[in-house]
Structures are given as structure tokens and as C-alpha cells.
């Protein structure tokens, strides 16, 4: 991770350390983890894991997992290179899911606005179908782009 991002992670970690500790021992799924906001979250959670004995298991679904190839190996980070908007079955018991996968191209938004919305909504539908009976899942956060509005 570059120096600017690392410094941001240190600052955020120090400010929210106690809140982040509530995630210790939990499994978190992040879709769209290579995007601007969620990649910061992935880096922050990895930094948390460096500083704490009780780790957070981080699973990232994205079509651009190469973004994290410079991080090296971490047994608490699983990168899943796939398209969440396609029919897939998710089986891992997650405590939290943050769904932020979306098409990230203003040019594409303008040319194909419905496809932009479909990719985001279909991904959410796949998540909801996979976890509608989950007893471990505490929360799903759904993020979208302002471009779709």
C-alpha cells in the first residue's frame, strides 16, 4: 500500500480502534473492494489485522483483485475474482456484507444507464438470495453510485 494510504489507515485506526475491535473474529464480505472507497476499507482492515491478535477475516469479490497483488500473502484476506452480478452461490457464513460492486465508468453510465443499475441490483439480489436464511449475518450495507440517479 502506498505511503499516503498507509498514513490514512494509521490515522483512521487510531481514531476508531475501539469500534473496529467489535469486528475482531468476524468474517466480512466486501464486493467491489478494488473501488476507491472500499479499497480504503480493505487496507484499513488489513492494517487492523497487523495491530491485533484477534483478526478480521476479509473476503473481497471483485473483477480487479490484481489491485491487491502488491500486499503479499495474508491468511485473513481472500480475493475472489468474479462478477457478483452473475448467478453465483455464496456459502461462507459472513457476519457483515458490504456490497459496493458497480460499473465504475461515467462514460458507460451515460451510454448504458440501465446496465449500470442492473449490475448493482443483480449483485445485491445474488447476495440476498444466498443469505436470506442466514443466522450469522448481522448486517448488509448496500452502496450505489450517485451516477445512477
Task: Please provide the spans of the model-predicted regions.
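Conserved Rossmann-fold NAD(P)-dependent oxidoreductase catalytic core, especially the SDR/UDP-sugar
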Residues: 99, 125-149
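N-terminal Rossmann NAD(P)H-binding glycine-rich loop of SDR-like oxidoreductase domains
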Residues: 27-47
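NAD(P)H-binding glycine-rich loop region in Rossmannoid oxidoreductase-like domains
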Residues: 84-119
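Conserved glycine-rich Rossmann-like NAD(P)H-binding loop of the short-chain dehydrogenase/reductase
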Residues: 50-67
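Non-catalytic terminal and boundary segments that flank Rossmann-like NAD(P)-dependent oxidoreductase
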Residues: 1-29
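Rossmann-fold cofactor-recognition segment
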Residues: 73-86
Amino acid at each position: 500500500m502506498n505511503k499516503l494510504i498507509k498514513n490514512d489507515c494509521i490515522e483512521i485506526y487510531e481514531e476508531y480502534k475501539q469500534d473496529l475491535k467489535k469486528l475482531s473474529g468476524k468474517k466480512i464480505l466486501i464486493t467491489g473492494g478494488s473501488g476507491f472507497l472500499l479499497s480504503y476499507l480493505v487496507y484499513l482492515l488489513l492494517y487492523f489485522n497487523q495491530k491485533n491478535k484477534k483478526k478480521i477475516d476479509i473476503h473481497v469479490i471483485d473483477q480487479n483483485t490484481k489491485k491487491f497483488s502488491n500486499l503479499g500473502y495474508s491468511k485473513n484476506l481472500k480475493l475472489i475474482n468474479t462478477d457478483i452480478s452473475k448467478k453465483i452461490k455464496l456459502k461462507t457464513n459472513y457476519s457483515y456484507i458490504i456490497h459496493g460492486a458497480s460499473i465504475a465508468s461515467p462514460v458507460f453510465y451515460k451510454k448504458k444507464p440501465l446496465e449500470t443499475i442492473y449490475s448493482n441490483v443483480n449483485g445485491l439480489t445474488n447476495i440476498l438470495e444466498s443469505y436470506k436464511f442466514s443466522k450469522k449475518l448481522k448486517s448488509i450495507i448496500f452502496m450505489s453510485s450517485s451516477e445512477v440517479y
